[in-house]
Amino acid sequence: MPFRDVIGHNRLIDLLARSVAGSSLPPSLILAGPSGIGKRLAALSVAQALNCLNPAVDGSTIDACGVCAACSRIARGVHPDVMLVEPGDNGSIKIDQVREVIDRAQYRPFEGRRRAVIIDQADALVAAAQNSLLKTLEEPPPSSVFLLVTSRPDTLLPTVRSRCPQLRFRPLTAEDIARALMARGYSETQARAVAATADGSLGRALEASAGELVDARDVAQRVLAEVSSARDAGRRLESAKELLTKTGASGATDRDHLSIHLRAMSSLLRDVEVLVTGADARVLANPDVQPELERLAGVYQGERGRQAFTAVDEALAALQRNAGVKLVADWLVLQL
């Protein structure tokens, strides 16, 4: 995965490319940001740029060729100088895993220019494993770089965070995700509908099929319509049950189902705002349901529309804080 193939994050990718080219890459870095937005791919791009046999140098930047023997082996996960550490079956990264890569990192690269240790989901490091990293992060081997990839940097020990500069990766734009999906064979309509509910995560967009996301959108649309005409709390709470219906992958949790419905609802409410404000309908994320959107626009306009959009955002944030799933669904329908 050369730098040029990473979707979005242009400023950070340019910074990494310049750092590799100028030999100014810090010996340890935290790549932080939401799940599924390309942090791990960016880390692999660094590893390729450091070890590519035929790198392309353009002024003050560098990029891997992506096709040489070294790049191919890194992409396949079999390069001896690129070590990937991931959580085990129990969901954590144990101290033995960390000790092994620390020992290997002390030696000169076997065949490349620099060893790269990529710790994916670094927030899964148990406390003992994090503590075992401290000395290495404080006095890193000159021929190695440690890249800690995490969606929850706040769970890392302060002593770990203080030793590693942090790069903050932001959610991808819906346009970036739609382009990536179309490159994978999605129609433009499908790609835009999926991207609108992906919450800035290409990984999330790729995990769910277009059909699953359309089902989720139908549920969200139906709940908005039902709640808009319900005058008493009892009827609204009945609608909350629909938000907990199973939509998506078979192994998904109730929290996952509610989350996908709320992201679909957020996408619909954004489109409603487009119609209410008289903006160009060509920017709608869900143009195939424009008649239904226009009916919702008759209700969710002005202050009520703004309150509904804010309530959905707050509900999604509450889910991320592990609030009770049923409690979040019930609270939301009473706010819409």
Write out the residue ranges for each language-model feature.
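Conserved alpha-helical scaffold flanking the Walker A/P-loop in AAA+ ATPase domains
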Residues: 15-19, 95-116, 124, 128, ...
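Conserved Walker B
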Residues: 121-125, 153
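Charged, glycine-rich active-site and insertion segments that engage polyanionic ligands
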Residues: 1-49, 70-73, 106, 142-145, ...
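Loop/turn-to-beta-strand initiation segments
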Residues: 111-116, 141-147
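Conserved catalytic/switch belt of AAA+ P-loop NTPases
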Residues: 131-145
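AAA+/P-loop NTPase substrate/partner-engagement loops
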Residues: 61-93
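Flexible beta-alpha connector loops of hexameric P-loop NTPases
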Residues: 88-95, 122, 166
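Post-Walker A helix-loop "phosphate-sensing" segment adjacent to the P-loop in P-loop NTPases
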Residues: 48-63
